[in-house]
Amino acid sequence: MSNQHALLISNLLPVGSNISTWWNFGSMLLTCLMLQVLTGFFLAIHYTANINLAFSSVVHITRDVPCGWIMQNTHAIGASLFFICIYIHIARGLYYGLYLNKNVWLSGVTLLMTLMATAFFGYVLPWGQMSFWAATVITNLLTAIPYLGVAVTTWLWGGFSINDPTLTRFFALHFILPFIIISLSSIHIILLHNEGSNNPLGTNSDIDKIPFHPYHSYKDLMTTTSMIILLFIILSFSPDLLNDPENFSKANPLVTPQHIKPEWYFLFAYGILRSIPNKLGGTLALLMSILILTLPPFTHTFYIRPMTFRPLSQTLFWTLIATFVMITWTATKPVEPPFITISQLTSIFYFSFFIMNPLLSWTENKIMMQT
């Protein structure tokens, strides 16, 4: 494998000539990761992992530290852009059948779960009102584990409730996990370039390849620059656009927010969790909302990879995207009719995609055989 990679580098990484802009999100994600590690380091210098000082230390960073407000807001907005890019990256993989490269896809799902854990721990650190209560609700789900649940939850909390030890270990985990993400990203990229990138047509890229640099590197640079410009526009004109208003108040265990919810990029999973009126069932559904992404590599039934020439599969795919948006929207609403019913229906549609897609692909095979 090492010899192969030496050849790839010496040949300036030959890739298919027809890969589109949808293939640019990998480089955008790498840029986001570098940005998050850099800004996170400077924030960690001034942050204090103590329940009495955490909120004040974040206020100190934004008010007193030179350029601190830029670091803090860039880190917060960067997290949102990170998840926008990763969700588009996953959607691209589903649409173009890139999951058939099993090793790359499964390493990507592992990366996604690590990233979500990192983002969750980071959301708790400012010790705002919504941070505290979201952490209480989500970590309390561990009590649903049979026999071991209470012991695991107590161990994670470092006591019988979320307190100072919890914040300290969450800070430690949030600090160390990005380095694990960097390692997993390296594995993801090595596995990808071991077999080579696919293309929008799903054909063999070996027929027509060009050097990655300068042809695709400049294309990557354009989308990455556009993303950074978008980040600076939000940072300059509406830095609190993606923040929860409740987090501008210090955590108070005696006052429960009217509607507890995590950051917007977790709302689809939270919406699926809320749609099931059972703690264990909801927790399993929450886990399956991510783990079900491991299914497509083993259930692909169509004889070509992408959905480019499959109108029925395309319709189902865009239904999944609409469902994802709808679940996210319902999760922002109170647990009352009609949002309960909408949430339950959209959750069923979400999981149905992964069952219906192989069946529909099989049907499309039959139709195409007859024509």
Swiss-Prot record:
Binding site for heme b b566: H89, H188
GO molecular function, one term: metal ion binding
SUPFAM superfamilies in UniProt: a domain/subunit of cytochrome bc1 complex (Ubiquinol-cytochrome c reductase), Transmembrane di-heme cytochromes
Domain of life: Eukaryota
Residues annotated for heme b b562 binding in this entry: H75, H174
Membrane-topology annotation of the record: Multi-pass membrane protein
GO cellular component, one term: mitochondrial inner membrane
Chain ranges passing through the membrane: 25-45, 69-90, 105-125, 170-190, 218-238, 280-300, 312-332, 339-358
Cofactor: heme b
Keyword Electron transport listed: yes
Gene3D superfamilies assigned to the protein according to its UniProt record, in alphabetical order: Cytochrome Bc1 Complex, Chain C (1.20.810.10)
CDD domains according to UniProt: cytochrome_b_C (cd00290), Cytochrome_b_N (cd00284)
Binding site for a ubiquinone: H193
Keywords annotated in UniProt: Electron transport, Heme, Iron, Membrane, Metal-binding, Mitochondrion, Mitochondrion inner membrane, Respiratory chain, Transmembrane, Transmembrane helix, Transport, Ubiquinone
GO biological process entries: mitochondrial electron transport, ubiquinol to cytochrome c
Intracellular or extracellular location(s): Mitochondrion inner membrane
SUBUNIT field: The cytochrome bc1 complex contains 3 respiratory subunits (MT-CYB, CYC1 and UQCRFS1), 2 core proteins (UQCRC1 and UQCRC2) and probably 6 low-molecular weight proteins.
Recorded family membership: Belongs to the cytochrome b family.
Chain's role: Component of the ubiquinol-cytochrome c reductase complex (complex III or cytochrome b-c1 complex) that is part of the mitochondrial respiratory chain. The b-c1 complex mediates electron transfer from ubiquinol to cytochrome c. Contributes to the generation of a proton gradient across the mitochondrial membrane that is then used for ATP synthesis.
Protein name as annotated: Cytochrome b
Organism encoding this protein: Micrurus fulvius
